[in-house]
């Protein structure tokens, strides 16, 4: 698998992502936060057009993500490796901080992780909760999954609906939406 990490300031990050897509890399992980939405829309549209024309599909994790880690095997991104322990629980979250908290709590009680994935919190991103849940569902190294949601969109709901009818493994879904939602706002 050919992969690239993108640690480029926001004005040039979309171009760096597209460069990796044009090179037919399998996976691009973009840590950069605050890439202009218009730039990311353009990259996403070009990625979809390339795939529609039969071009190779490149998976994009992020932007604004901490990356991913499979303990004792691979770490791509900025996740603190010392809190992770090898195990059989998958973790997926849009929030880096909440990912670290969940992983730290799991590790402290002796439950390790198969893989932890931070998908990123920017408005236009690549892989969604549902994509990672499908991967965990097929992963023989994962026995259960923690899915952590935030305020911001329908992705967590879509993943939860998919899990309800398709997931073969136990899922703990945590959403901080209503705990942090201003009282005068609806989602």
Give the ranges of each region predicted by the language model.
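Conserved small/polar residues in nucleotide/adenosyl-binding loops
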Residues: 1-5, 177-183
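N-terminal glycine-rich "phosphate-gripper" loop used for MgATP/nucleotide binding
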Residues: 5-14, 32-36, 149-153
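Rossmann-fold NAD(P) dinucleotide-binding segment
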Residues: 12-30
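Generic hydrophobic/aromatic pocket-lining and core-packing "Φ" positions
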Residues: 17-21, 103, 133, 160
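General beta-strand structural signal in soluble alpha/beta enzymes
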Residues: 30, 59-64, 68-70, 93, ...
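Rossmann-fold NAD(P)-binding glycine/threonine-rich loop
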Residues: 34-56
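Glycine-rich anion-binding loops of enzyme active sites
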Residues: 44, 48, 59-89
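Short glycine-cluster motifs
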Residues: 87-134
């Amino acid at each position: 698998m050919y992969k690239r990490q993108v640690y480029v300031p926001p004005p040039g990050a979309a171009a760096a992502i597209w460069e990796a897509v044009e090179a037919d890399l399998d996976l691009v992980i973009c840590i950069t936060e605050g890439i202009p939405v218009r730039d990311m829309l353009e990259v996403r549209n070009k990625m979809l057009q390339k795939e529609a024309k039969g071009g190779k599909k490149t998976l994009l994790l992020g932007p604004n993500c901490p990356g991913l880690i499979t303990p004792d095997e691979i770490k791509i991104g900025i996740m603190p490796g010392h809190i992770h322990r090898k195990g059989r629980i998958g973790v997926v979250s849009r929030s880096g901080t909440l990912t670290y908290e969940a992983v730290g709590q799991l590790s402290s009680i002796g439950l390790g992780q198969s893989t932890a994935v931070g998908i990123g919190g920017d408005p236009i991103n690549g892989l969604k909760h549902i994509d990672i849940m499908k991967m965990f569902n097929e992963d023989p190294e994962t026995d259960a999954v923690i899915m952590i949601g935030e305020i911001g969109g329908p992705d967590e709901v879509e993943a939860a609906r998919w899990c309800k009818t398709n997931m073969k493994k136990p899922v703990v879904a945590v959403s901080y939406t209503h705990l942090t939602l201003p009282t005068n706002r609806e989602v």
